[in-house]
Amino acid sequence: MRFSLALLALPALAAAAPVPGGGKGAGQACNSGPVQCCNETTTVANAQKQGLLGGLLGVVVGPITGLVGLNCSPISVVGVLTGNSCTAQTVCCDHVTQNGLVNVGCTPISL
């Protein structure tokens, strides 16, 4: 019975598959790595005021755009299927550093 429920959920996962050339909108996965679940997101300006980006020197090339995700962990397809989805903010981040402690270039997405 559980196997058949998992098979029924596959079309929903196909809707969340990456779309070639598409942006990071609702129902789309990350092109730069796994979708992240972040306990907090903030603007780059706020993160700089709080000194959160000082340790990233040399890691991020170019200007930082988007949001900064804090205390993030990757979301797996299995986690979504079993109901262990994100209860905070789901984001797609360009640069994941310090094992998800600080992620930069994040864009909120819906699963």
From Swiss-Prot:
Glycans are attached at residue 39. Aerial growth, conidiation, and dispersal of filamentous fungi in the environment rely upon a capability of their secreting small amphipathic proteins called hydrophobins (HPBs) with low sequence identity. Class I can self-assemble into an outermost layer of rodlet bundles on aerial cell surfaces, conferring cellular hydrophobicity that supports fungal growth, development and dispersal; whereas Class II form highly ordered films at water-air interfaces through intermolecular interactions but contribute nothing to the rodlet structure. This is Class I hydrophobin SC4. Self-assembles to form functional amyloid fibrils called rodlets. Self-assembly into fibrillar rodlets occurs spontaneously at hydrophobic:hydrophilic interfaces and the rodlets further associate laterally to form amphipathic monolayers. GO terms for molecular function: structural constituent of cell wall. Residues 1-25 form the signal peptide. It comes from the Eukaryota. Induction: Expression is regulated by the mating-type genes in the secondary mycelium, and especially activated by both the MATA- and MATB-controlled pathways. It comes from Schizophyllum commune (Split gill fungus). One of its GO terms (cellular component) is extracellular region.
